């Protein structure tokens, strides 16, 4: 096989009159009055190849037998297209190849879908034939970008003196939030390894070991309910440092992300990134990962409406809740009564009992609850919300967390529905000053807001033993366009603080030792102050590539039900394998 001289997509006017050898796939073949045209595709793009009997009758005869997705080698000469033949849609559109030889390296069955961008095909079929789906230029470009992003992270961290150190995939199951993927041990029947949800504890032990600056581009595994921006296995840019403040860790993170965006998108991002406390984010946006590319901020109107004779508002306030509103400027005409009823159903999915609304018309409030607002109170409400003619006012009244969840989700929906979001903008945001614990309604207790190794604010450490719900954390999340792309914190590095943390989480001293004894031992051997962050590589690429689903950024992903249609994983194993592992399936659910 002759060595390739160029990739198809690299050819341009500077190559005119050069002889080239190209390898690739037949994207399209056209027979036009004795001439055959082939669009030849490789990972860098497409170039047109012309087969003319005046140049090679033999090549023309072979070209007549090729079909889409045949793999071929073509030798020929780069030629300038005529002015009327230029194809502005192709990067190579000003040139073509005059074919001298063609060799068919392999044939292809007719693919189950066209290998081209914009093809209308189900996700299930795309994943079943993922190797064909990945041939499409738009998919190919995503993985070029992923390579660029990964390379840029590596180069930056290397330049900053970080060591790339691998941590094991077969480790101990510890309670970190989601369910573990378990791997049975053949050598120790009845015992299991766990695939890591993150390298959290191990990277902290690397700080105890004195490596000072660690990073790893690492695969993580979580057996949790899936959604569009989650997969059971995913990749993190994981880093940890000793003796640095959280501000310095944030600065390093900003520098990395600025370099990544510049390399991947050619866009310059200013620093420092804006910062917002967790409380402010929840108050203003109803979300701990707010999209700050548009307004529609939540406004607390409890003081304004506490005296109005509307029982929904009164009851919420009397029971310790609140009333908040969104002013959708100039949007009243966009929503009929039916549309507003649909919004009420939408917020009910987030726990809200309903959605009250008002429109401002000719200076007056109009709508089902307008009668509860006498003139003076109506003026007060309009002033509080800066409401003008044409505005749509939307209200939720309930416990603070339900109001935040429902209006926060509604805000995001309205931002999209009203076309308020600049899709080309990249809006980074730090969310800081997190509570150390959050209440889990299902479990009926407080759990770690991040993980059990997060350092409490120094002044709050005594509260671990008395009122843990009030403890604040040295934690920081980074958000991009409404997605959490990373979470970090300073870590607990003293044994007595870690013991208090475990007690606050409901561990007995015995259970803490059983689960985390190796970490507790390490904390007795001079562990330095340390902290770090983990960034979601798949999610970062998803946003930069303008996609809506993590599946598009992972070469061989799972479906929303954690199934791989390509390999049919997960699958059954033989009785012999189960016997080797001393395992027995006690119940099999039939679908």
UniProtKB/Swiss-Prot annotation:
GO molecular function terms noted in the UniProt entry: aspartate-tRNA ligase activity; ATP binding; catalytic activity, acting on a protein; nucleic acid binding; transferase activity
BP-aspect Gene Ontology terms: aspartyl-tRNA aminoacylation
InterPro entries to which the protein is assigned, alphabetical: Aa-tRNA-synt_II, aa-tRNA-synth_II, aa-tRNA-synth_II/BPL/LPL, Asp-tRNA-ligase_1, Asp-tRNA-ligase_1_N, Asp/Asn-tRNA-synth_IIb, AspRS_core, GAD-like_sf
Region (Aspartate): 200-203
PROSITE patterns, alphabetized: AA_TRNA_LIGASE_II
Entry-linked SUPFAM superfamilies: Class II aaRS and biotin synthetases (SSF55681), GAD domain-like (SSF55261), Nucleic acid-binding proteins (SSF50249)
UniProt keyword list: Aminoacyl-tRNA synthetase, ATP-binding, Cytoplasm, Ligase, Nucleotide-binding, Protein biosynthesis
Top-level EC class: ligase
Top-level lineage group: Bacteria
Residues that bind ATP: 222-224, 231, 484, 536-539
Catalytic activity from the UniProt record: tRNA(Asp) + L-aspartate + ATP = L-aspartyl-tRNA(Asp) + AMP + diphosphate
Compartments reported by the entry: Cytoplasm
DNA-binding is among the record's keywords: no
Cytoplasm is among the record's keywords: yes
A Gene Ontology cellular-component term: cytoplasm
Broad class of the protein's primary localization: cytoplasm
Binding site for L-aspartate: 176, 222, 450, 491
PANTHER family in the record: ASPARTATE--TRNA LIGASE, MITOCHONDRIAL, ASPARTYL/LYSYL-TRNA SYNTHETASE
Binding partners and assembly: Homodimer.
Purpose of the protein: Catalyzes the attachment of L-aspartate to tRNA(Asp) in a two-step reaction: L-aspartate is first activated by ATP to form Asp-AMP and then transferred to the acceptor end of tRNA(Asp).
Name under which the protein is recorded: Aspartate--tRNA ligase
Native source organism of the sequence: Listeria welshimeri serovar 6b (strain ATCC 35897 / DSM 20650 / CCUG 15529 / CIP 8149 / NCTC 11857 / SLCC 5334 / V8)
